[in-house]
């Protein structure tokens, strides 16, 4: 049922959010996480492959690009991610999660496949850049649509650990990308090897598209957009699937019923004005988490090879082996301590991981300046730091995906993702200059101190502004805009502050 003037005025009464949140974990949820979570694996895969094949593309028997032209490949991919997040984020809130998580994956597949088909010579590097923009748009759109879908279909008590683990799988993709490029560049002729490396992602995406086709639309999105019959069909399908393995399902608390009036769509200008006017502390909190983690990650991730090469004299051919240890730390953090964000709580864990990673980076910076580290111990320090930082950074994505109303969730994710990427790109650019020719470690030392300060700032802000969202329904954290008589009704018209079920002190 699509919203009509009659339903818009009378509203729709529904228990669908409560029915989703009371479900036990089942094979359906595992299938959902695997099918949707591959987005982060693909992003890690793409970034790593692009970094590792870069030197090969300068050779005369490949594309014969200059070093600066190769460096621009990542820039164009990043630009694509930002525009993709904003464009597809808007469409996801308007057209639905399922439609978009099929489209965005297809866009990525096309872009990355075109990269592998880039002709050699002349001005074909423009074709290469264009294909990277397309691939980036697909992945950027994935961030907005997929985070929304996962949050809306995972039961409340599992949402934190699942979202953090899924975001952390970026590093599984980075690890896979390292192995792929080691094999492709060392065992296949260079002219073909880099192309084979770029085709691994599209092949994986093609398989996942068929899996995603069988997933239902988010019942939460459907009911909030007045599609009551479709929403009932989707939740019934999910409950039937869960019931096959879990037997009789827990009863639904009738007091959790919501009365909803579908709301009209809003643009990004109105969204930004509303977020920072009516949700100021939550907006500042979300932006701070995303900016600080993105700055540190881009600064370290895109320059680690230069640090190993210039300061520790590691040959480029051996750099990937150090990187695999770095990936392992980043992956294990979210997988092993992610559940604590649901049990100990968001505030303590987010502030704790940000503060601890900042403090550990200060210690590492002091050891680096004193010349007390070698390539192995430097990598071990990074691995320990990012064991905690990765969990915290993943929680940043979780935060911006759960603390704003459902009707604008994908657009809100897109906005904060775009802001973070813009600041993150400054980190890699700055650190590249600080490294210089590797003769003086003082400048990089202060760069590490700056990165540590950024993470500590994020931890302090989290301690004061975090939203205690653990175990709570999304509708209790931020009331949907269309809830009749609820605290979010008319937010874009009335000008009154709107919170949700969490106290203002927890992040208004």
Segments from the language model and where they lie:
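Transmembrane-helix signature of 12-pass secondary carriers
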Residues: 1-508
């Amino acid at each position: 049922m699509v919203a009509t003037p009659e339903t818009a005025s009378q509203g729709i009464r529904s228990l669908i959010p409560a029915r989703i949140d009371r479900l036990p974990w089942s094979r359906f949820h595992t299938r959902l996480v695997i099918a949707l979570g591959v987005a982060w694996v693909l992003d890690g895969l793409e970034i790593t492959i692009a970094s590792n094949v870069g030197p090969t593309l300068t050779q005369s028997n490949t594309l014969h690009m200059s070093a600066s032209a190769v460096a621009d490949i990542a820039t164009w991919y990043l630009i694509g991610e930002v525009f993709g997040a904003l464009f597809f984020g808007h469409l996801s809130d308007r057209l639905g999660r399922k439609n978009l998580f099929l489209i965005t994956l297809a866009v990525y597949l096309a872009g990355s496949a075109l990269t592998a088909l880039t002709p050699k010579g002349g001005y074909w590097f423009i074709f290469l850049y264009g294909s990277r923009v397309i691939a980036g748009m697909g992945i950027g759109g994935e961030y907005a649509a997929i985070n929304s879908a996962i949050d809306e279909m995972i039961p409340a008590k599992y949402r934190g650990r699942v979202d953090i683990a899924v975001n952390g799988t970026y590093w599984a993709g980075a690890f896979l990308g390292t192995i792929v490029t080691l094999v492709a560049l060392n065992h296949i002729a260079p002219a073909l090897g880099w192309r084979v490396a770029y085709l691994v992602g599209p092949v994986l995406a093609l398989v996942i598209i068929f899996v995603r086709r069988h997933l239902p639309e988010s019942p939460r999105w459907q009911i909030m957009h007045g599609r009551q019959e479709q929403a009932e069909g989707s939740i019934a399908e999910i409950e039937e699937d869960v019931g096959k393995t879990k037997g009789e399902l827990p009863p639904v608390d009738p007091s959790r019923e919501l009365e909803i009036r579908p709301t009209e769509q809003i643009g990004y200008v109105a969204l930004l004005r509303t977020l920072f006017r009516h949700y100021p502390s939550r907006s500042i909190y979300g932006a701070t988490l995303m900016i600080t983690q993105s700055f540190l990650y881009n600064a370290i991730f895109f320059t680690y090879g230069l640090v190993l090469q210039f300061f520790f004299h590691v040959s480029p051919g051996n750099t990937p082996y150090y990187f695999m240890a770095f990936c392992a730390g980043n992956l294990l953090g979210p997988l092993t301590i992610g559940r604590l964000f649901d049990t100990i709580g968001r505030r303590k864990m987010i502030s704790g991981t940000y503060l601890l990673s900042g403090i550990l980076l200060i210690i590492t910076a002091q050891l680096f300046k004193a010349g007390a580290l070698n390539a192995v111990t430097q990598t071990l320090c990074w691995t320990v730091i990012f064991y905690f930082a990765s969990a915290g950074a993943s929680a940043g994505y979780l935060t911006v995906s759960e603390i704003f109303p459902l009707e604008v969730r994908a657009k809100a994710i897109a906005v904060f993702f775009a802001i973070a990427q813009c600041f993150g790109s400054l980190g890699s650019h700055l650190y590249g200059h600080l490294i210089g020719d590797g003769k003086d470690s003082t400048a990089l030392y202060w760069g590490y101190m700056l990165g540590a300060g950024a993470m500590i700032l994020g931890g302090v802000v989290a301690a004061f502004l975090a939203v205690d969202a653990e175990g709570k329904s999304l509708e209790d954290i931020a009331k949907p805009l269309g809830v009749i008589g609820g605290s979010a009704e008319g937010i874009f018209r009335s000008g009154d502050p709107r919170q949700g079920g969490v106290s203002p002190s927890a992040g208004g």
